Amino acid sequence: MATPVVALVGRPNVGKSTLFNRLTRTRDALVADFPGLTRDRKYGHAHIAGYDFIVIDTGGIDGTEEGVEEKMAEQSLLAIDEADIVLFLVDARAGLTAADIGIANYLRQRQNKITVVVANKTDGIDADSHCAEFYQLGLGEIEQIAASQGRGVTQLMEQVLAPFAEKMENADENDRTSEEEQDEWEQEFDFDSEEDTALIDDALDEELEEEQDKNIKIAIVGRPNVGKSTLTNRILGEDRVVVFDMPGTTRDSIYIPMERDGQQYTLIDTAGVRKRGKVHLAVEKFSVIKTLQAIQDANVVLLTIDARENISDQDLSLLGFILNAGRSLVIVVNKWDGLDQDVKDRVKSELDRRLDFIDFARVHFISALHGSGVGNLFDSIKEAYACATQKMTTSLLTRILQMATDEHQPPMIGGRRIKLKYAHPGGYNPPIIVVHGNQMDKLPDSYKRYLSNYYRKSLKIIGSPIRLLFQEGSNPFAGRKNKLTPNQLRKRKRLMKFIKKAKR
């Protein structure tokens, strides 16, 4: 199931942005603001009450009963249409207003949406008496919160996301408390034991085989009019495949199975392309929701940039989402044909300057319209996915760590040198390396970057981000009670199950 989408709507100054920041800050999410495209609308990832979801701040709506639809910006309407859940915020202190009534009248027409009235700013007042008049809106119970203090926010999200629990992958992963699983983990595994670390390597090998057996999912993302539709159609046209459109809800992307050179792929279409070989030159409808969900669901992301335009903050925001999601990356510079050589040189110089922090990604200069360079993309796609899922062992990672520290020792802290003991794999896609040692909390960021670059060079990882986790002592999960993500919980359960079986 696609990640649930929660839209925050309401008139100005009712606390939507405060609630948005409260929700997204729970995961230190990268929040993108797309000026011009979405005006003052903000989109972010959030994790609260055990759920992952996307939250939209739709901005203030100054509507009236007669003209609310005219007053709502097009992007606000789109956000409501794309949302699974609409949280309609009202100000408990200010009371019911004509704008609230107008917005409620519009929302009542959206019968297919879960709509919840949320009375904010209930701190320091008799909330029940102040909220009573909001029942006139005819949208059911009134939920009370104080977003600035966080009061009632977790309970609110638990309630509104509950209908999705059975459909979400991690719904049954949190039945046992983190403390119970932490205790079992610490009892079962000794990370100073070669036998146990070898068993973990074997367990991760099983996970790696599962990853490698999958179709490679490719998402083509980028700003409007950079040529996503043209590139999608060119790829499908070149491969002469039958396109199976499998639309879900109005906000779901289209998943198109295809094959090339014996490798199965799934192309995630966020541009709304439906027919192979038919390129529409009209302005593409840009959906941030489709883009974020496609990035999360993909293995490899093709970030498409228009060679005739400068790299924008929107490009960098999309790039931030890709890196934050840990996805493999290929940079595609489209509309390369017909440019003068001096313009090409200037574009390459600009790419080197603005994108120097992702020098691990391959860059392709193509013309989606004419097809030049498109076929070569698949070499980089396969390379990036292979690097993201390559086999790593504890012995190999520890050996590389030793070489790195021999060449450049960690710094002295308080007269004691930071000691890095060993490393082991923590997962794949993206590659995760867990480094154990003493005084890890004092290890400078510059040295962490050095180790990351050293591992990348030694393992020859191209096109994929690499993540290093630094753990004090021998237990990789020490001090992380209640902080594991659902994916980490699932991974740890698989490891425990595998090693218990192997020890019998």
From Swiss-Prot:
Acidic residues compositional bias, start-end: 180-191
UniProt domain EngA-type G: residue ranges: 4-168, 216-389
KH-like domain mapped to chain residues: 390-474
Single GO term (MF): ATP hydrolysis activity
Biased composition (Basic and acidic residues): 168-179
Record: residues binding GTP 2: 222-229, 269-273, 334-337
Lineage top rank: taxon: Bacteria
Family of the protein in this entry: Belongs to the TRAFAC class TrmE-Era-EngA-EngB-Septin-like GTPase superfamily. EngA (Der) GTPase family.
Subunit organization: Associates with the 50S ribosomal subunit.
Function summary: GTPase that plays an essential role in the late steps of ribosome biogenesis.
Protein name: GTPase Der
